[in-house]
C-alpha cells in the first residue's frame, strides 16, 4: 500500500470517527441541573422538528402547527362573526391563541424557549400560567416580568428585560411551596405557602396554559421537562 493510500485511509477513518462521535453526542439527553433538586428524569424533550406530541399538546389543529422548527399557535378565528357562526355561541370564541402543555409533574424542572409575537399588552395578556389559573408569569410595560401567586403576593422583576416579540429563555424549578424562575439569565427563588400549581377544579391538570391576547401568535422553539425528586 503506497503513501497516498495510507493517507486516504487515515482521513476516511478520522471522518468516520468524527461522524460517529457527533451522532453519539447528538443523541445524548440534555444535562440536568437544579438548585432545588438532586435528581431528575427527563420525561419530555422537543425541538419541534417532527410531529406534534399529542400527549403534551393535544391533536394538531389549524391554529397549532409546526413550521420551520417551531410550534406556532395562532387564534382559531379571525373575527367574532366567523367564530359565532362556527361555534354557535357568543363566548370563548377563540379570538386569541391559547395552548396547554399537559401532564406536568408535581415536582419538576422545565426549560422553555418561547415568545409571544405581538406588539402591545392588553389587560391580563399575554400570560403564562404555571398550573391552570395558578402561578402567573406576565410582562411589565417597560420590560421585565411579574410573578403572581394564586391568592398570594406578586413579585416584580425588571432586570430580566423580558419584552414582547422577543425570545424568552426560561427555566422553572418547582415543588409545592417553592419555585425558582430564571428568565433570560435573571434568577430568583420564591418560597411561600401560596406556591402551588394544583388547581382542584382543573380535571386536566397539572398543566401549563399560555394565553396570547388579540393579534398575537405564540411561538415555541424548544421544551425540556424533568420529573424531579429531592
Put a short name on every predicted segment.
Residues 78-147:
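Secretory/extracellular carbohydrate-interaction modules
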Residues 149-169:
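Short, aromatic/His-centered strand-loop micro-motif at the edge of beta-sheets
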Residues 28-61:
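Extracellular carbohydrate-recognition regions
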Residues 33-34, 96-102, 156-162, 209-210:
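Beta-strand-rich interaction surfaces with strong enrichment in secreted/lumenal proteins
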Residues 9-20:
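Bacterial N-terminal signal peptides
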Residues 192-221:
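Flexible glycan-contacting loops in extracellular carbohydrate-active proteins
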Residues 52-83:
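Extracellular glycan-recognition surfaces and repeat-rich motifs
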